[in-house]
Each structure stands twice: as structure tokens, then as C-alpha cells.
Regions:
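Short hydrophobic/aromatic beta-strand immediately N-terminal to the Walker A/P-loop
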Residues: 7-9
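NTP-dependent small-molecule kinase module
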Residues: 147-197
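Glycine-rich phosphate-binding loop used to anchor ATP phosphates in small-molecule kinases
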Residues: 52-106, 139
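Phosphate-binding P-loop
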Residues: 1-4, 67-68
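Conserved substrate/cofactor phosphate-moiety recognition/catalytic segment
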Residues: 22-72
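The conserved Walker
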Residues: 13-14
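Conserved lysine of the Walker
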Residues: 18
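A glycine- and Lys/Arg-enriched "phosphate-lid" helix/loop adjacent to the NTP-binding pocket
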Residues: 97-145
Length: 197
């Protein structure tokens, strides 16, 4: 039996360690729009924001189309703060892809802001406070509302150095596990929903 290709949504708040930790959990090279935007701004400091944003979107669409056409694994990094992720899931599911979520969690928006400040101090990219707060709340709400869209779920603690797995759900094998003492963010934000799957 041929292996189904997989779309992996790498989600979580700003500063949760998505870019740093996802290579340990996702074999497909992930599309990281924030990194591409940062690279474009460095290479083309004279470009207006709309050119940079437009280039990021066109690159995402190009890589998405290539993955769909070639039936190859694709990973996409996001805060899940918009409906774009839902449209992407629809497109990949219609093409026969398995859909997985790899979620990196933090306790609250202040923790997210603090981690972005630390990231900037160590040479990483910045995100405005109001955007971080919006992404935290909208991303959390969308993730909570749409857990059932995913065939596989992996929740990872963004506060741990190496990204400890907190909970795992694999539909095909009916695997459904939560660590004995999950972090508070998982208990408060996801445990009840996760246990209802």
C-alpha cells in the first residue's frame, strides 16, 4: 500500500519555538514565512512592505502547488490566526493528503511577548506586541475549534529546551496519550478538548 503524503501544520504562538524545534518533529522542510520575510527585508531594504508580503505569499502558493502536484509531504509554519490554514487543509485533504498538527504551546500572551523580546536580543526576528497578542488569542481559538480536522495531533511544550511532547493523537492507530503531568497551558487550553477526541 502506497504511503499517503502528509500536510503538517506547525502552529503555536509567536516565540513558542516552532522554527527552532519543528525539524525534530517534522521530516518535511517547513515553509517559514517569517524567516522568508526577514531574509527579503535584509536583501531588499528598499522594498515596500506590500512587495515583501506579496513575495512571501507567492512563494507559499508556489511551494503548495508543487507539493500538491508531486504528492509530496508539505509543512507550513503558522500562528493559525487566520482562515488561510483552513483553506490549505481543504486543498490538501481533497488531494488525498493526511493532515497533521504539531502545536507548540505557551501559557499566555505575556509569555509569548517575553519570548519574542528574548529572540530579538539574540538576533531573531521581531513581531509587534499587538500582533503577538492577536496571534496568541486568534491562533488558540482557531486551534481549539478545529482540532477534529486533523488525523494526527502532537502537542509540544514550547517552554522546554528540546520540545517535550505533551500529548499525542494518531487516528489510524487509535493512539491517544497525555503525559502524567502536562504543563499548565495544556491543561487550561486543550486537555478537555483533547480528551474528547
Amino acid at each position: 500500500m502506497e504511503r499517503r503524503p502528509e500536510l503538517t501544520i506547525i502552529a503555536g504562538p509567536n516565540g513558542a519555538g516552532k522554527s527552532r524545534l519543528c525539524p525534530f518533529y517534522v521530516s518535511a522542510k517547513s515553509f517559514d514565512g517569517d524567516k522568508l520575510m526577514l531574509d527579503l527585508r535584509r536583501e531588499h531594504p528598499d522594498w515596500p512592505d506590500r512587495w515583501v508580503s506579496g513575495t512571501v505569499v507567492s512563494q507559499l502558493e508556489k511551494q503548495k502547488a508543487e507539493a500538491l502536484e508531486q504528492h509530496k509531504d508539505f509543512a507550513f509554519e503558522t500562528n493559525f490566526s487566520s482562515d488561510m490554514v483552513l483553506h490549505m487543509i481543504e486543498d490538501f485533504r481533497a488531494a488525498g493528503f493526511k493532515i497533521s498538527l504539531c502545536y507548540f504551546g505557551l501559557r499566555n500572551e505575556d509569555e509569548s511577548v517575553s519570548r519574542v523580546i528574548h529572540r530579538v536580543q539574540t538576533g531573531g526576528h521581531d513581531v509587534a506586541d499587538d500582533v503577538i497578542r492577536f496571534n496568541f488569542h486568534e491562533g488558540l481559538k482557531n486551534t481549539q475549534q478545529h482540532l477534529r480536522l486533523f488525523d494526527n495531533l502532537t502537542f509540544i511544550d514550547g517552554n522546554s529546551d528540546y520540545g517535550h511532547i505533551v500529548a499525542l493523537h494518531i487516528s489510524k492507530s487509535q493512539t491517544h496519550k497525555v503525559v502524567d503531568n502536562p504543563p499548565l497551558w495544556f491543561k487550561e487550553q486543550f486537555e478537555e478538548l483533547f480528551n474528547g477526541l
